[in-house]
């Protein structure tokens, strides 16, 4: 594996660990280029999908901190090729507040496929395919 690919995988693992730890602001922004975008494809929580720029990504991280008591990412598989990384992960998130029919402390579970494109060692584009288990 080329050193750039290995480095990008290390960055993604650190990024997911930062999300698990509740990183916001600069602690999260450091993983992204200033012109970064996140594309969230339609899913149970966001039926129309969403395109977010970096300020919106950071704002949503703060919202997530209020919504979730905890979250984790269990990487099932990962692959890097050039400036691209793809991961498959299982995600459980425990609610800090009620959400729809779910009570506080309920755990949601999802299966993610996330594709990243890098520029200069930072995430320029993130595409999420999030499949939530029924609740």
Give the predicted meaning of each segment.
Residues 9-13, 29:
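Amphipathic alpha-helical segments that line or abut small-molecule/effector binding pockets
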Residues 16, 20-23:
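Alpha-helical assembly-interface signal, strongest on the long, hydrophobic N-terminal helix that forms
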Residues 1-10:
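Basic/polar N-terminal segments that are highly enriched at the extreme N-terminus
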Residues 1, 17, 46:
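Generic anion/oxyanion-binding catalytic loop in active/binding sites
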